Swiss-Prot record:
Belongs to the universal ribosomal protein uL6 family. GO terms for molecular function: rRNA binding; structural constituent of ribosome. One of its GO terms (biological process) is cytoplasmic translation. Transmembrane segments: none annotated. It comes from the Bacteria. Keywords: Ribonucleoprotein, Ribosomal protein, RNA-binding, rRNA-binding. PROSITE patterns: RIBOSOMAL_L6_1. NCBIfam families: L6_bact. It comes from Brucella melitensis biotype 1 (strain ATCC 23456 / CCUG 17765 / NCTC 10094 / 16M). InterPro entries: Ribosomal_uL6-like, Ribosomal_uL6-like_a/b-dom_sf, Ribosomal_uL6_a/b-dom, Ribosomal_uL6_bac-type, Ribosomal_uL6_CS. This protein binds to the 23S rRNA, and is important in its secondary structure. It is located near the subunit interface in the base of the L7/L12 stalk, and near the tRNA binding site of the peptidyltransferase center. Part of the 50S ribosomal subunit. This is Large ribosomal subunit protein uL6. GO terms for cellular component: cytosolic large ribosomal subunit.
Length: 177
């Protein structure tokens, strides 16, 4: 029994939600999102909340149950408040800058890395060593942040590279003479 799936998802103030078949749509101050729930899961509106139940007690239905509830919850939070992911750059000469709609990264390569920011995502560079990725879709914000981090992930000896804000890098000891 999914402890997460059992709880109904309350529709926050300022968000209008509708359920049409297996599609949940939400509209809020930040924008509009929809999520198609898996066929193994039943979804319905009850008393200003969205309720998610498994169609039967099969393993697949139970495995999709909690995930579907969380995805619907993320849609509501996204259209109301949005999501944000911060990245930090550390290393000599490593920096970031916005160039129009593209993010330009100097990460120690012989060339500049230019990242084309997808639609629906906003990237800001408050400092040359800090990147802030924001948007209404939690999955897309996380994916963009992961793609930026992938260009030069933090290395374990000096900690140089792109890392998430607050991420702890497990450091290794260098060679001994």
């Amino acid at each position: 029994m999914s402890r997460i799936g059992k709880k109904p998802v309350p529709v926050p103030a300022g968000v209008t939600a509708s359920v049409e078949g297996q599609t949940v749509k939400a509209k809020g101050a930040k924008g509009e999102l929809s999520f198609v729930v898996h066929d193994e899961v039943l979804v319905k509106m009850e008393d200003g909340a969205v309720r998610v139940d498994p169609r039967d007690q099969s393993r697949e239905a139970r495995s999709k149950w909690g995930m579907s509830r969380t995805m619907i919850s993320n849609i509501f939070v996204g259209v109301k408040d949005g999501f944000e992911k911060k990245l930090e750059i550390s290393g000599v000469g490593y920096r970031a800058a916005m160039q129009g709609k593209n993010l330009q990264l100097s990460l120690g390569f012989s060339h500049e890395v230019v990242y084309d920011v997808p639609a629906g995502i906003t990237v800001a560079v408050p400092k040359p060593t800090e990147i802030v990725v924001t948007g209404i879709d939690k999955q897309q914000v996380g994916q963009v942040a992961a793609e930026i981090r992938e260009y030069r992930g933090p290395e374990p000896y000096k900690g140089k590279g792109v890392k998430y804000a607050g991420e702890k890098i497990v450091r290794k000891e260098g060679k001994k003479k």
